[in-house]
Each structure stands twice: as C-alpha cells, then as structure tokens.
Amino acid sequence: MEINETIILDDRGFVKINGDEAKSFLQNIVTNDIEKITDSLTLFSSIFTPQGKYLYEFFILKFEDGYLLECEKKVTSEIIKIFNFYKLRTKVNLIDVSKKYTNIIISAEKFKEITKTPHMEGLTLPCEVGSTLSCENERIYVDPRNKNLGAKIISKIENTENIIKKLNLKKIDKKNYYEKSFVLGIPQLNLTKLKDKIFGIENNLDELGGIDFKKGCYICQENTSRIKLRNKLRRRILPVKKISGEIYENDIIKYKDMEIGKIVIDKPYSFGLIKVVDPDIKEFINIELSCGTSKVKILKPEWIV
C-alpha cells in the first residue's frame, strides 16, 4: 500500500463495552492483559473455550467511557452472546455498534505523517504495533499484530469521505489488504472455520501479540501456558498457496508421503493446520507439496525463524 492509498473494510464489526466492571470482566476472560490498554495503546486478543480451543479474535481499544472491540462483522452477535454467557451479574454493558462505525486502513507511513501534523505537535508516539492516536472523533492505531498491515482509523461511518478527503487518500480494493495479510501468514476471513477445532495458540496468537503469558487467569490460561512453556506446540496455522488444481477444506497435505497437515480454510485465501516438528517445518517450507489432487506450497511468514 502506498502512503496515500486507503482501504475501507466494510466487513468489520464493533462492540462497545462499558460499565463499572468492564475492565475486570474482560481481564477474566480474554487472552491479553487489559491493564495495558491506554489511550495510546490498542491490543489484539482472543477468547478460548475452557479446553483451550479457539473461538474468536478481536482488537480492544480504549473508547469513550469504556472499550471498543473490533472483530469480523459476521461474528459480532456471537461474541456478544458468549460474553453475555460469562457476564452473569457483572456490571458491564455490551452493545453492537457496527452500524455506527467503519474501519479505514492506512499505511504505517501515513500514520507517521499524521503524528507530524501541526495539531499533533509535540507528540512522541512511535509507529509501533498497537500505537494509538486518540483524536476527538476518531481512534487511529497501528495494527497490533504486524505493522506491515498498516494502521486503522476507527470513525463514524458518516465521516468516512471527509477523512479520506482531509488526508488526501485514494481508495483501493480491499483484496490488496487481505492478500498482504495472507502473505504475512495472518488469516482474517472465514475464521469461523477454525472455531472449536484448533487450540487457540495454534493460530499463532503467541507470535502476533495476542496472548500475555504473564497476566493472571483467563479462560484456559493454564493449558495454554503449558503448551507454550513446555514447548508442546506441534502445529500452526500457515498460508497455503495453490500451484495447480483446486484446494478444498480438509484436503490432506503430504510431504514425501507423510501427512504434514490439512486445509482448514479453503477460500478466499487458503490456510492449513501444519506440523512444525517431526518433520521440521524447514524441510518442506516453500517447496511443492501434494494437497488432495492439487499441488501447493506452504509459505514462510516472516516470524518463522
């Protein structure tokens, strides 16, 4: 993405979370440390089943008198439902505000430019993952997972065109954003196909800053920490690129007649649950492999050493 390009993500949902016990409520159920969230820091996080299986992922930022949760729009109501399940008598409000807000993607370079504008004079905020600008009507934050995904402007829908004009931005297709995310090894579409099927940590949340292993208890904290600290993580979600044929969900991926993984998300961008040990992932990364009746290769995200 060039510095003056922008992408409107109209497939993102938003949940406003407030109330006297909003902070403690979130701290007890999500994987990241809510205490670290400030007006200048946004976090990526998730919620697991009691067995440690993946459910949903989202961003959490300070917002008005509480927090704003950003997620895949089609799971907004499901997230509210699971949060309500754990709410019990807790003093917290959960409101779907997806019809009020939108997500405007800008480059990290544009974020840097914004911090240097006259009304931001004196600001020393670095362009690091999660760095957040709290303006009067908008929140602007660098993607907490990987700053190569740029920054997000969270704004009221009716202000979208004014922001684009004010920042001298040109809209491009959102496929550019999702293709970049695919190459970086970060799935963002059709994540419901992972729900309750993989351990949360297998979706690379540890590598993407989505889990704080030093915070107190959250749902399935003990098992998740055990997998990480005892080096028991044997599979990860990785991008799978088609060489020939078609890729389908549950297709088996083989290397030298050994089953090393299977497709868990087939469209629009394919991801597989892939072994990282026995055999070592370095043996088969970026080489031609069989996948059902097709040929594929597993891409190497930058965080794989």
Language-model features, listed with the residues they occupy:
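Acidic, proline/glycine-enriched N-terminal capping motif
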Residues: 1-57, 61-64
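N-terminal auxiliary interaction/assembly segments of multi-subunit proteins
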Residues: 49, 74, 302-304
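Short, surface-exposed ligand-recognition loops at beta-strand->loop->(often short) alpha-helix junctions
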Residues: 16-22, 36, 106-110, 241-248
